[in-house]
């Protein structure tokens, strides 16, 4: 489905593909099964099942799909007009956020769908599209605004955290922030394990002290405080769901 404003929903199923692509509007490329490889500004992004990559209209990518089975994907394009409208509605001073979202300042990155508002929306859209539920124009117009709300909500948090990193070189700033996000995702995925700092920073090219310092500056909490808070949140959800204290204890 697509409209005259450059909003679109597309599904794909390919075993092999190689080519260049210019992102249309604000685009999320979600991998339903398999994996896709993106090369953007000299950096490689491997997008696995349950993950998506996010870019704006200035993003140029080389894409490669090469699998034994079909790689199934969902692509959602949102026009800059809608992103502007939603950002202006939710933020009284949206200029800096919009500049981050819609210019070459934007942080292209991959995200695990289970951890974001947009990821939840993409899962739901894939379910509905697979069931043939997206044929009504009004429904799709409302859907694009809803997706834009998810993007703006997620990226407003990213922008706030990213802005706390004070480095003059944009490449350095972006690289360090991606490493911090990757480390945080590792923590989220291993909350029930005995996590060690060496494991968390295994792919980060920095010392333990430098990592702790940057993590706390960016996310306000130290790595230990972050893990503790997430474990307490998880325990609370389990208790509310009927689990007993013994089952819930880490």
Q: What do the predicted segments below correspond to?
A:
Residues 1-102, 127-138:
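N-terminal regulatory/effector-sensing and dimerization cores
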Residues 2-3, 236, 246:
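Long, hydrophobic/aromatic N-terminal blocks
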Residues 5-6, 14, 29, 105, ...:
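A short alpha-helix capping/helix-coil boundary motif
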Residues 7-12, 69, 87-96, 116-120, ...:
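Short, highly charged low-complexity linear segments
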Residues 17, 39, 65, 72, ...:
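Generic anion/oxyanion-binding catalytic loop in active/binding sites
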Residues 85, 103-168, 175-178, 182-185:
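An amphipathic alpha-helical interaction segment
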Residues 153-156, 165-177, 182-233, 240-243, ...:
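Basic/polar phosphate-binding segments, predominantly the helix-turn-helix DNA-binding elements
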């Amino acid at each position: 489905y697509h409209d005259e404003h450059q909003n679109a929903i597309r599904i794909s199923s390919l075993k092999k593909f190689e080519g260049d692509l210019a992102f249309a509007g604000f685009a999320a490329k979600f991998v339903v099964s398999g994996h896709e490889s993106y090369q953007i500004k000299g950096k490689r992004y491997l997008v696995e099942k349950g993950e998506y990559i996010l870019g704006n209209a200035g993003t140029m990518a080389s894409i490669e799909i090469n699998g034994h089975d079909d790689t199934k994907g969902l692509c959602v394009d949102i026009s800059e007009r809608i992103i502007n409208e939603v950002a202006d509605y939710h933020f009284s001073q949206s200029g800096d956020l919009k500049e981050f979202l819609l210019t070459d300042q934007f942080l292209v990155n991959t995200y695990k769908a289970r951890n974001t508002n947009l990821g939840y929306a993409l899962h739901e859209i894939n379910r509905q599209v697979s069931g043939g539920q997206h044929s009504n124009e009004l429904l799709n117009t409302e859907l694009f605004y809803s997706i834009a709300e998810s993007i703006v909500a997620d990226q407003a948090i990213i922008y706030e955290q990213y802005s706390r990193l004070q480095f003059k070189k944009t490449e350095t700033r972006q690289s360090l922030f991606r490493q911090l996000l990757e480390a945080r995702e590792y923590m989220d995925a291993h909350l029930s394990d005995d996590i060690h700092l060496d494991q968390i920073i295994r792919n980060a090219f920095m010392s333990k002290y430098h990592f702790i310092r940057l993590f706390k500056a960016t996310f306000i909490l130290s790595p230990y405080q972050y893990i503790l808070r997430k474990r307490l949140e998880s325990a609370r959800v389990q208790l509310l769901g009927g689990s007993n204290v013994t089952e819930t204890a880490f």
